[in-house]
Amino acid sequence: MEPPQCVEELEDDVFQPEDGEPGTQPGSLLSADLFAQSQLDCPLSRLQLFPLTHCCGPGLRPVSQEDKATQTLSPASPSQGVMLPCGVTEEPQRLFYGNAGYRLPLPASFPAGSALGEQPPEGQFLQHRAEVQIARKLQCIADQFHRLHMQQHQQNRDRAWRQVFLFLQNLALNRRENREGVGPW
């Protein structure tokens, strides 16, 4: 099973330690090849919480493969009967819309008078970039949690409808036994 194209294109400083840091050995769990493994080898995919592509943002996927569950629904969606998690009365506001996470504004610490061609001090740039990548990963985790919660809610609802259907089927097929009180009791 080939890893998805987006895993090969991923440039992620958060999971690529500097030379000499622990975890830079080839067999280490912190090595940069962690997310380039097959889905069976990926330690996070074994938890069934993160697919292999959990580290890929929406901008790295082709539009045909983009995960629609991470997109915000239109404001008219509550009138269309969209399910929300238990106890939630309104749809949560997304931090990023579509590919907007890749077009973040300049950090507040960026000097306003400097030209865009100038680079901020190296430490600030790397810190800001790491924060953005962590925010993307947290957003991805939150989306996955919401998806799993909605899936569980749907399964519970399907189970309840199945029980109602079986009750009505039993009632219709066993009319004589139900009328005469004949049964296993």
Curated annotation (Swiss-Prot):
Family to which this protein belongs: Belongs to the Bcl-2 family.
Domain of life of the source: Eukaryota
Region: Interaction with DLC2, residue numbers: 67-75
Manganese keyword on record: no
Biased composition (Acidic residues): 8-21
Known function: May play a role in apoptosis.
Quaternary structure note: Interacts with MCL1, BCL2, BCL2L1/BCL-Xl, BCL2A1 and BCL2L2/BCL-w. Interacts with the myosin V actin motor complex through its binding to DLC2.
Residue ranges of the motif BH3: 134-148
Gene Ontology BP terms: anoikis; cellular response to starvation; cellular response to UV; negative regulation of apoptotic signaling pathway; negative regulation of autophagic cell death; negative regulation of autophagy; positive regulation of apoptotic process; positive regulation of apoptotic signaling pathway
Gene: Bmf
Protein name: Bcl-2-modifying factor
GO CC annotation, single: cytoplasm
Region Disordered: start-end pairs: 1-28
Presence of the UniProt keyword Ribosomal protein in the record: no
InterPro entries: BMF
Keywords: Apoptosis
